[in-house]
Amino acid sequence: EDNLDQRYAHATGESVEEVWFLSKHVASSERPCLTVHPIGVPHLSSEEKPPFGGRSGRAPPPSPRMSAIWRSLLKVADDPRIPDFEVSLEVTHHGPWMTTPCAFLEIGSTDSTWGHPGAAEVWLDVLCELLGDEFEGVQSPVLNADLPVLITLGGGHYAPRANMMASEPHAILGHMLARHSLLFDQGPDGEVGGTWREAVDEVVRSTRAAHPGR
């Protein structure tokens, strides 16, 4: 559902700084996996209805901690509790809409793995380590203004280029647009159209919103 951050803040009086959705991942491959990704449907025109929520042409700010989550997940990729699981980033896709920085943290890809105890324990360890480090004074990536923030364009859904770049500690990952979200068409006069330009502009705006002052 859209605007969960605002609705929670209104109901509780508490401000919402960041949202992590612990969710199920669905894939036709049915491979067991743990995935991380930002959300949004910036490639859709205003006439198109998003099939899985969100606002057409918009992308919520990505979690500034997404790269840190990914690096922590890589550390436990060979954990014996998840012997058959792969780990991967995914590109920006689906809803809901919100204005608070967010990310989806998922277990996939079928009902036989959605309730996998080892996968749930690994995710718990990843998040506890990340938050525990911050509580103990380790600098949050949100506060490190010296690190560049990256946006990736092109490639497939599982973002192999972003997987590699975000594994390094010297950069922060923002939105990722796969080639299927960069829609081009050519008019009769040869001019290139499509929603690709609007999609790029939106993820740049959204990523900047997640990192004010950069």
What kind of region is each of these model predictions?
Residues 1-99, 110-111, 117-121, 128-162, ...:
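N-terminal catalytic or cofactor-binding beta/alpha core of small enzyme domains
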